C-alpha cells in the first residue's frame, strides 16, 4: 500500500515537472499569443503601408476628377446665367399656352383654334424642344399675356 502512495505521488510530481503541466501550457500559450500579436502587427503595418500608397494614388485621381467636376459645374453655371428660363416639358402645355399660340402663328403660320388636340400636342413637343435649346426669341421667355387664338378678326365695338 505504501508503494501505491509513492506511485501516485510520483505521478503527481511527474505531472508537475513535465512540460505539459497546466502552468507550462499557460506560459507556452502566452508566448504563442505574444508571437502571434507581433506577427499580426507586422502584417497590419505592411498592409497599412500598401493601403496608404494605394490611397495616395486614389487621392490623386480623385483630385483630377474633382477638378473636372468643378469645371463642369462652372460650365453649367455659365449656361444657367446665359439662359435665364426654366426648361419645359410636355406637361407645361397649359401653362405656356399663350407663348405656344404666338409661336404657332409666327413660325408655323397656324392658329391654335384650327388644330386638333393631337396635332396641337405634337406641335407643342416641337415648341418645347426649341424652348429648351434656347432658340426662341426673347419675347417667348419673358412671357406673353395673350396669344392669337384664331384667324377670325374680332371686331368688338365699345
Curated annotation (Swiss-Prot):
<dbReference type="GO" id="GO:0005634">
    <property type="term" value="C:nucleus"/>
</dbReference>
<keyword id="KW-0217">Developmental protein</keyword>
<comment type="function">
    <text>Component of the auxin signaling transduction pathway that regulates cell proliferation and differentiation during flowers stigmas and styles development. Involved in the regulation of auxin-related genes.</text>
</comment>
<protein>
    <recommendedName>
        <fullName>Style cell-cycle inhibitor 1-B</fullName>
    </recommendedName>
</protein>
<feature type="region of interest" description="Disordered">
    <location>
        <begin position="1"/>
        <end position="88"/>
    </location>
</feature>
<feature type="compositionally biased region" description="Basic and acidic residues">
    <location>
        <begin position="1"/>
        <end position="11"/>
    </location>
</feature>
<dbReference type="InterPro" id="IPR044688">
    <property type="entry name" value="SCI-1-like"/>
</dbReference>
<feature type="compositionally biased region" description="Basic residues">
    <location>
        <begin position="48"/>
        <end position="58"/>
    </location>
</feature>
<keyword id="KW-0927">Auxin signaling pathway</keyword>
<keyword id="KW-0539">Nucleus</keyword>
<dbReference type="GO" id="GO:0010928">
    <property type="term" value="P:regulation of auxin mediated signaling pathway"/>
</dbReference>
<dbReference type="GO" id="GO:0009734">
    <property type="term" value="P:auxin-activated signaling pathway"/>
</dbReference>
<dbReference type="GO" id="GO:0048479">
    <property type="term" value="P:style development"/>
</dbReference>
<feature type="compositionally biased region" description="Basic and acidic residues">
    <location>
        <begin position="22"/>
        <end position="47"/>
    </location>
</feature>
<feature type="compositionally biased region" description="Basic residues">
    <location>
        <begin position="67"/>
        <end position="81"/>
    </location>
</feature>
<dbReference type="GO" id="GO:0048480">
    <property type="term" value="P:stigma development"/>
</dbReference>
<dbReference type="GO" id="GO:0051782">
    <property type="term" value="P:negative regulation of cell division"/>
</dbReference>
Amino acid at each position: 500500500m505504501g508503494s501505491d502512495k509513492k506511485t501516485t505521488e510520483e505521478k503527481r510530481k511527474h505531472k508537475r515537472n513535465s512540460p505539459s503541466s497546466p502552468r507550462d501550457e499557460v506560459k507556452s500559450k502566452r508566448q504563442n499569443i505574444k508571437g502571434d500579436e507581433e506577427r499580426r502587427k507586422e502584417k497590419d503595418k505592411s498592409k497599412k503601408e500598401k493601403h496608404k500608397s494605394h490611397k495616395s494614388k486614389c487621392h490623386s485621381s480623385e483630385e483630377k476628377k474633382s477638378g473636372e467636376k468643378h469645371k463642369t459645374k462652372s460650365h453649367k453655371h455659365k449656361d444657367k446665367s446665359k439662359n435665364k428660363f426654366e426648361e419645359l416639358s410636355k406637361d407645361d402645355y397649359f401653362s405656356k399656352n399663350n407663348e405656344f399660340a404666338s409661336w404657332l402663328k409666327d413660325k408655323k403660320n397656324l392658329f391654335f383654334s384650327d388644330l386638333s388636340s393631337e396635332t396641337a400636342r405634337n406641335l407643342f413637343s416641337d415648341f418645347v424642344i426649341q424652348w429648351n435649346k434656347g432658340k426662341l426669341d426673347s419675347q417667348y421667355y419673358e412671357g406673353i399675356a395673350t396669344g392669337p387664338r384664331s384667324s377670325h378678326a374680332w371686331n368688338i365695338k365699345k
